[in-house]
């Protein structure tokens, strides 16, 4: 009985780790964690989740405000 319970919790934990890794961002973090180089994660969202904080916007995005440090809030062009 204890072996079944341990196996269940192990598989449950592995499922959430795989889901977190496949999303591309660190799921569950309310605040962006700086990388060792001091830069913030590219996947940080801005403008109520409609944009992404980046150093430079992609070709199909336009700058729409500022994020932390010297990052731009980039939104998709419509």
Swiss-Prot record:
Q: Please state the span of the N-terminal signal peptide per the UniProt entry.
A: 1-27
Q: Where in the cell is it found?
A: Secreted
Pfam families xrefs:
Defensin_beta_2
- Disulfide-linked positions: 43-74, 53-67, 57-73
Q: Which GO terms describe its biological process?
A: defense response to bacterium; innate immune response
Role summary: Has antimicrobial activity.
Q: What is this protein called?
A: Beta-defensin 105A
Record organism? Pan troglodytes
Q: Give the gene that encodes this protein.
A: DEFB105A
């Amino acid at each position: 009985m204890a072996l079944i319970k341990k196996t269940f919790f192990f598989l449950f934990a592995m499922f959430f780790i795989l889901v977190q890794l496949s999303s591309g961002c660190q799921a569950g973090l309310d605040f962006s964690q700086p990388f060792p180089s001091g830069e913030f994660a590219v996947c940080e969202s801005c403008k109520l989740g409609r944009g992404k904080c980046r150093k430079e916007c992609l070709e199909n995005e336009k700058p729409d405000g500022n994020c932390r440090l010297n990052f731009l809030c980039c939104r998709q062009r419509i």
